[in-house]
Structures are given as C-alpha cells and as structure tokens.
C-alpha cells in the first residue's frame, strides 16, 4: 500500500513561462535576442552546471550563483552586458516568481491528495523555491520540501533520493515518485520507488514508464 507521494516541482506543479527555466521574462526584456540565438544561449548555459550545482542554503548564496552563471554565459557568447544587467538578472531569478506559472488545477489536486498520502516535494532547485511555495500557498500541502541546493547534490546523483528515503524510512512499494524526466525516473526506480512520468502538456510520445497527465491519477 502506498503511503507517500513524492513530487517534482518543474512540469509537475509549475512550468516556465518562456519555455526555458533560465531565460526568464526579464532576460528577454534586457537582452537583445536579435543578436543572440536561443539555442546558442542554452548551449552556453549548459557549460556551467558546476556553478548551478554549488551548495546554497540562503537567497544571498543563490544570488551569487546566478550572478556568476549569467556572467559566464555571456562571456562565452562574447556578448557584452553591464554590471547592472547581471545584477538584475540574478536578483530577478532569486527574488521573484513571475518566471513560473502554476497549473490551474494544482490546488484542488493537492487538497485531495494530502488526505490520502504523505506529500513530499523533491526538487532540483534553489532557496527561492521555498518563498515561492509559501507565497503561492502551496507549502501547507507538503510534509517536507527537499531542495537540492541545500544538500549540495541533485537527483541525477542518486544520493538525493537516499536522503529522503532514509529520513522517512521508506520501504519498497510504499512510495510513488512523479517527475517529467525519464532518466531521473530510471534512477528513482532503482531506489525502489514506483515511478510515473508526468506529461501535463501532452508532448511525450513514448516512455519506458507509465505516463500520466495530471495528479488526479492518484485519487
């Protein structure tokens, strides 16, 4: 019998408004996209996963991460930006939530599910996730929220799952895990979690895991 429902944040509770997590609405306002190709930007950003993987437990530490992240991204693109723009981009990512949209039915889904499961959030994310969850009145649904930067790890390392599993003493067959990323579900399955792949937008053609389109599946 399932006792726990472990959820990812991105594409399960929330989505990015611009199509990419790090290209925020403010990014599109401040950066001349006629001079930069989006694919080139994303390719440049992919070089700095080490920066994004730094341990951060405060918003100030997160700000430093994203200041360095954007600075290095523009350096590799040979695109000149002012100090003010770098600061504004880092502030925007860390201290605002307008970059995210939340699925319309998420409150009703969680309100029902909290009476059936122990709800846990497991997210590759940064300290900004906590105030965002609070401001959107979502934290109250979760028994605990695990943010990867607090532990200096991420789901792809596997040990992030171990932290949660050990703290709750979760036995095989006791927990569902929902994520939109097939490779992360592979890792979760190795940890004896019963996995489902979320596809709220209906874009996944096939997967080795069972595909769901909302959290009503778990009612």
What residue spans do the PLM features occupy?
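Substrate-recognition element of Asp-dependent hydrolases with the DxDx(T/V) motif
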Residues: 83-102, 106-134
């Amino acid at each position: 019998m399932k006792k726990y429902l472990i959820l990812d944040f991105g594409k399960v509770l929330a989505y990015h408004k611009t199509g990419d997590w790090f290209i925020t609405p403010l990014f599109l306002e401040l950066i001349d996209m006629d001079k930069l190709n989006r694919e080139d930007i994303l390719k440049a950003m992919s070089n700095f996963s080490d920066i994004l993987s730094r341990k951060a437990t405060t918003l100030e530490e997160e700000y430093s991460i994203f200041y360095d992240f954007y600075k290095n991204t523009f350096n590799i693109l040979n695109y000149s930006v002012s100090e003010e723009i770098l600061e504004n981009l880092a502030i925007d990512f860390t201290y605002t939530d307008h970059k995210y949209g939340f699925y319309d039915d998420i409150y009703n889904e969680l309100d029902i599910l909290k009476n059936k499961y122990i709800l846990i959030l497991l997210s590759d994310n940064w300290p900004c996730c906590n105030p965002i969850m609070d401001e959107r009145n979502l934290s109250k649904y979760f028994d605990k929220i695990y943010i990867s930067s607090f532990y200096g790890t991420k789901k792809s390392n596997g040990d992030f799952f171990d932290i949660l599993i050990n703290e709750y003493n979760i036995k095989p067959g006791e927990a569902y895990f929902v994520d939109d990323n097939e490779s992360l579900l592979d890792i979760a399955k190795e940890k004896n979690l019963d996995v489902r792949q979320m596809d709220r937008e209906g874009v996944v053609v096939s997967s080795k895991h069972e595909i769901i389109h909302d959290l009503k599946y778990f009612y």
